[in-house]
Amino acid sequence: MRALLALEDGRIFEGESFGATGTRVGEVCFNTSMTGYQEVLTDPSYRGQIVAMTYPLIGNYGTNATDQESTQPHVRGFIIEELSKIPSNWRAEESLDDYLRRWEIPGAQGIDTRALTRHLRTRGAMKACLTTEITSPDEAVQRASAGEGVIGMDYVREVTTPNIFQWDPDDQLSRKWSLQSGDQVLPPIRHRIVAFDYGMKRNILRSLRQRGFGVTVVPATTTAAEVLALNPDGVFLSNGPGDPKALPYAHETVRGLMGRKPIFGICLGHQVLGFAFGGRTFKLKFGHRGGNQPVKDLRSGKVAITAQNHGFAVDPDSLPKEVEVTHVNLNDGTVEGMRHKELPIFSVQYHPEAAPGPHDASYFFEQFAELIANSS
């Protein structure tokens, strides 16, 4: 079956449908990861977006329940060059085609993803319509233009937990996956923290528990007073989807916690912290999405290759003098990390937990533990 990808600027790509049929509209973006497509599909940060993978062959190892970063996929559509129709992995439970069909997510293969990526890199991320139903390219372009983008959108309310809960109280979900037999012993809980769920990935929760954190997950709309009533040792701000400017309730809450608890934010949490500091964000031309983004630590001069997924960045000129930019992206010079010079608060724009991606930045979880220990 024919699949049509129409961009709001009139560019048309034709391919073959896989997964579900139907019509979906959202911002189209590209991810440069070679593997980890299931983690990409189930990352809540992709809520409202159509994702194109730049690696040419996708679906090689199928899908399984263990590697999901949330309970369900969040992308609106999935664009690839070639689908591997016969997955080959002993852990595979379902093909990518069947998985997307079960979750009613349309996909398109046979798309020239290199040409699509070059177009988005030149023109910028934009709204798109992915359809197996609309036969007229002009109509599909009109649907794309009339659809919602990401700017001004609060998708966090769609993906946050509705209730407060304790992550993995029985220590059954946080052990590292390994081929080796025998149980892996998790460290004792040294610090109890509250984690704001703006769209949090499971591997963040696993990474925190593996470093000795006991984690209470709270909805994104939880107030500062409600958090303080839990009396945590620290506060974690998670990743998530949408426009950080559209979350005034989160800005207010974090502002109310500053100076009262140590705070560590990543991705959207980093951007929310930027607003809480009194700063602002701006939309990147095409975002940073993939596992090969070079980031420089301005204090040590060291460079790490990082996993990233964001379309906005903190404006360094908007930050007050009490806030120091600590990390920058070597590709475009944008802010990748910051800290408060006087308060126990720091954040990074990227994903130290990876999943998928390199583990160069996993040490930030240990730094958070040290920050809490030194602040108590």
PLM segments and residue spans:
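RNA-binding accessory domains that recognize and position tRNA/RNA substrates
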Residues: 1-225, 229-230, 244, 355-357, ...
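Residue-level detector of beta-strand face positions
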Residues: 4-5, 43, 294-296, 327, ...
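Residue-level structural signal for beta-strand termini and adjacent loop
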Residues: 17-18, 56, 309, 340, ...
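Proline-centered loop/turn at the N-terminus of a beta-strand
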Residues: 106, 192, 262-264, 280, ...
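Active-site-proximal beta-strand elements of phosphoester/diester hydrolases
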Residues: 192-197, 306-307, 346-350
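Cysteine-nucleophile active-site neighborhood
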Residues: 234, 239-308, 313, 357-367, ...
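Catalytic beta-strand/loop cores that center a nucleophilic Ser/Cys/Thr
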Residues: 301-343, 376
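A glycine-centered loop/beta-turn motif at secondary-structure junctions
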Residues: 337-375
